[in-house]
């Protein structure tokens, strides 16, 4: 039985857990678009250690619904086996929110069919494998938009010892 659990929680500790969900494995979110910015419920002070993710779109994922912000996250000593992407950061223009102070270290990845790490700030709702299989092309030129509160921001992301 496939089940996704979404909760509002602060200071979570996710340790020695196994995920096999067929979607994003360990996924941090904090609200969507204007409603997420208005509520301002930051997903923060997260510790993920010693977890294993089988299959799915991403092993560790932030977004795409991250308008309230995500900060102070430590991910270490995990295995991602057969996920489409290992580390996946996604959002889109108009969403807003700040993702910052993310530390990722000692991650083992096997049988990843696309990239070990992706940042997609024009996320359209499809996994990396779905985009590749569809033959869709990334537009050669994206219409520039002004930087404002609806512009997502990713900063201070540290990655070390990926194998």
Positions of predicted regions on the chain:
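Extracellular/periplasmic carbohydrate-active domains that bind, remodel
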Residues: 1-163
